[in-house]
Amino acid sequence: TGAHSFELGEGPVWNPVTKQLSTVDIFHRRVHLFDLENSTPIHRSSFDTEGDVGAALPLLGGEFVLCENKEIVIRYPDGTREKITDVPLQGKNLRSNDAKIGPDGALWVGVMDYDAVDGAGSLWRVSRSGDCQKLLSNLTIPNGLDWWGNEFWFVDGPVEEIRCYNFGYSGLEATDRRFTTNGTPDGLTFDANGEIWLALWGQARVDHFNKHGEVVDSVEVASPHSTSLCFAGDDLNILVCTSALFAMDEATMGQYPNRGDIFSVDLGVSGRPANSIFT
């Protein structure tokens, strides 16, 4: 099922406290909130941001961590804002992209050039106190990221692989583990069994990888640019996928009346709750 249309929808997160799903529309500078009714996202409200918003991550107290260009901000329920820091970027044409709060309590945020310049991107870890640590450099489109145990799995869009790193408080260590993707990888999430679900930009589908890197299932999406994923609902059994109108020609738009929508499906698989404590 599809509902609501985004230019560049990204970053779906389920909040088990408010029982709402949040997403961002990056270039429209807006955060959208949805209820789930019979597994379908129903739009309830939205609020504007002050910059292009790569991610809006809900915290337990009702706040959101906003990644606006290079600025990291906490937005409180009454609408007031607290600036945490500016990510110390080199270059002016950069913006935040995908981000999540890690199991270490820090914000992990990817940064890219607006024109997707090769090697201009990076991945950062940001603490609540504003400390910034660069984890990876020479990226192009830092996209999906998630953790399983002491493993960090990550994609850089033009590199058609999901790569595994060992992570600790000192940083990341590359491993030999990597899964090949059939298409441009975008957002990803682990399910409760430790298997990866990956949105594929330009492929109108989501692929399910087992622990050996084999694609064991694919889900068609009625929008070619599927962008990001999460599991939602009381039992975390509803897979939600955002999508985008961005970079789509008129002929393709005509073939996909639900282009840019947000989609949901019950696949009989459960996910895990998002990290929601920012330290």
Task: Describe the function of each predicted region.
Residues 37, 165-171, 267-272:
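Short loop/turn segments immediately following beta-strands, especially the blade-tip
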Residues 30-32, 71-73, 121-124, 161-163, ...:
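A short loop-to-beta-strand structural motif that recurs across blades of beta-propeller domains
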Residues 230-279:
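Blade-level signature of beta-propeller repeat domains, shared across WD40, Kelch, NHL, RCC1
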Residues 3-18, 48-64, 89-106, 135-152, ...:
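Beta-rich, blade/repeat-based domains predominating
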Residues 1-3, 40-47, 82-89, 131-137, ...:
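A short beta-strand motif characteristic of beta-propeller blades
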Residues 14-16, 21-27, 59, 64-70, ...:
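Conserved beta-strand positions in repeat-built beta-propeller and related beta-rich domains
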Residues 79-135:
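Hydrophobic alpha-helical segments and helix pairs
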Residues 36, 60-62, 76-77, 124-131, ...:
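Flexible "stalk/tail and boundary" regions
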